[in-house]
Amino acid sequence: SLDLKEGVLISDAGSTKSAIVNAAEENFAGKSVRFIGGHPMAGSHKTGAASADVNLFENAYYIFTPSSLTTSDTLEEMKSLLSGLHARFIEIDAEEHDKVTSQVSHFPHILASGLMEQTALYAREHELAGRFAAGGFRDMTRIAESEPGMWTSILLSNRETIIERIEDFKGRLDEISQAIRDEDESQIWNFFN
């Protein structure tokens, strides 16, 4: 049990919110603690002090996910505390946060890492694949350099929503695969339109 000052304001900066908000509500229930989930939508695939960027949060979204432990002044106090970041603050439900970030953040990391792994295996038999991977490939796979431990935690804490995104995308791949197989120019064109 933590010995916390009465009225203390607690937040986090994790990439998933539902599990964190639920844990905070469970662990701090009945205590004089204020909690608000936080997720700065800024970062880099790079790690360590050498990768620090003083302008990292400027104009980036900083998402707050209120809970039953969030008082009316908590949000304003957090905004004031973080005002020097020059971020754009937004408030949403933890569950909606996890759904949206699964599509625009978590799932793209899966795609990038999957494409890197597929290409590495392919290059064993076709060594020029690595040399020919140019700008578009680099743009798509840059985030595959992200820290694996962090991404393991993110995927496991938002697993159901991420699995939905994977299954949806598999369906889209099946559709374009079938269109190519059928030589359906219209369907292929529509895929890219």
PLM features per residue range, with description:
Residues 2-47:
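Rossmann-like NAD(P)(H) cofactor-binding subdomain of soluble oxidoreductases
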Residues 31-71:
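Active-site capping/gating segments
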